[in-house]
Amino acid sequence: MLSQRQLFLDHLGQTSDFPLMLEIERARGVYMYSAEGKRYLDLISGIGVSNVGHRHPKVLQAIQDQLDHYLHLMVYGELVQSPQVQLAEALAKTLPDPLNACFLVNSGSEAIEGALKLAKRYTERPNLVSCLNAYHGSSHGALSVSGSEQFKQGYRPLLPGVSHIRFNHPEDFTHINEQTAAVVVETVQGEAGVQVADDSYFQVLREHCDKVGALLILDEIQAGFGRTGTFWAFEPYGVVPDILVAAKGMGGGMPIGAFIASPEIMQVLKNNPILGHITTFGGHPVSAAASLATLHVIQEEKLLEQVSDKARLITERLQHPAIRGIRQRGLMMAVEFESFDILKPVIDRAIELGVLTDWFLYCDNAMRVAPPLTIQ
């Protein structure tokens, strides 16, 4: 009989020639357990997903409660489904006005696609601007606004009318003009290795977008839902985006995403044509119930208030001559080494010792540290 690992290689589409190949049987809290019974401390939260830990009891209960009522009923946007309505209302309460219209989808890439369409439809403009070294997803449009040619070159031609500027370089804003529908920016650049903007960057960007009439889309797929110590990473910057994108940590381990805007902007998807953006499974009631429970856990267990102390404790312990520095916002950290050749054995040894971490897509000399917010 073939092993699970061999069946994994034989029958599942692969993403690289070197998957981790850990066979995980169960998970709880900050730990995952292999089929052989080995325990792994999850320091990456499934790449920013398990913000409240694996299988949080309140998330599980919300899922079970929804299973007892219904699963999929109808394509998104037709029936009044309580999990969707309650989640959208709760999200609006975490956000400043006028961000109180929420379109639910299945993932971060889908949320980016919806946000790009919304911006083009609302402004009736053709062009988009994003940042070099940005990662917004793997679908066609999301890949187009991502900022690494290495990952795009095999799939061209991509969307026309997309240009890229440097992150945290306001002098590049001259590329944002009256033909720009939107500027899409990660509030914290994730796959570039946790690149954090200067305090004034987003304020200047907001002012420039207003000046030329371009929308500002902030991508908080990785940085949102408490990861940085505030519920939304943009809060300390004193700006409000026109469109906000969320996913990953939003679902407590279930697949869900959202793009959020003002009712004025969101309403353009309703007509000319009708059904301007549709999804069969977006906002699935089980995922929506899990997301609402996740939001409540973050608030009720006061996880935001704990992020700073936990981050400080981790950074205090990450002291070693091989570590060149640590970039961070809350529990979103990049531990920098001189090179990938030095970092890779560290990651391999950590996994051998039962600690799961990895490196970043565009920054392979930095170790990703982004544990569940529930870590003690």
Residue ranges with predicted function:
Residues 1-376:
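Conserved N-terminal phosphate-binding loop of PLP-dependent enzymes in the Aspartate aminotransferase
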